[in-house]
Structure formats: C-alpha cells, structure tokens
Amino acid sequence: MSVRHYARPTAVERLFNSLVAVLARVGVSVYGSRVLAVRGRKSGEWRTVPVNLLEHAGAQYLVAPRGETEWVRNLRASGMGELRLGRRRQAFRATEVGAADKLPVLRAYLAKWWFEVKQFFELSGPDAADAEIERIAGQHPVFRVDA
C-alpha cells in the first residue's frame, strides 16, 4: 500500500538539483544521475527532473526518495518516459514495483545514495533491518525501467 508522502525541496536542494540537471544535460553523470523526462498528466508537455538511475540485479530502477512527487504522478499516468544524459536519450516503459518486491531495490538504493537521501528516509541507516525498511517502503514509489 502506498502512503501519500512528499518532502518539498529546500532552496539549497533546488539549487543543487538544478546544477545536477545542467551537468546531466551536457553529458556529465554525477554518480548515476540522469534527467528524467515524462509527459505531464494534464498538459501533455515534457517535464524534466534530475534523478538517480539505479542498476540492480540486471535491471534499472527509479526510486522517489521525496515520495509522491509530480514526476511520480506523471509517470504513473503515462507509463513511459525518457532518461537523458547529454545527447543520449533512452526511451522506456515504467512498471511500478509492488510492495512485496521493493525491499532489495530500496536496500541497494540506500547503500549507494544514503549520503544524499538520508533525510528523506526515516531509518537508522542504509543497513537498517528489513522490517524498518518495509515500514517506510510505501512512502517511496519505485519504478522498473524497461527500454
């Protein structure tokens, strides 16, 4: 079950996200970053946001550390988008990962990006117990990315 949760970015976080997005647009990936482009669910216009692309167990995933963001809502509505890095564009279909399958993906995400996202997860650390991660899993949508 998904629990509605959203952590609004601070001014400093918006500035940092803008910097990461600019770097990704010119082809520089900061520790796996990409620009996610997805059509707006109401406007149909392309909307972009920097994201961390997780490669885990032979698949690619997008995790929403801030919860029910606009990109999450748009991706749920469209089911597809693009990951951009410089001039490269990877069109994909998105499948939301169910609660029963989130644990290993969230654990891998936290292991890689804990330093960056810890403030969005109410956890003791990246090596938190399974039960602790399962408790907050509903607040953080996860999508499998299939080219």
Give each language-model segment a name.
Residues 59, 66-146:
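Short, structured beta-strand-loop surface elements
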Residues 22-27, 38-41, 61, 68-70, ...:
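Intrinsically disordered, low-complexity segments enriched in polar/charged residues with Gly/Pro
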Residues 31-66:
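Short beta-strand segments
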Residues 1-33, 111, 115-128, 135-137:
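Alpha-helical membrane-targeting segments
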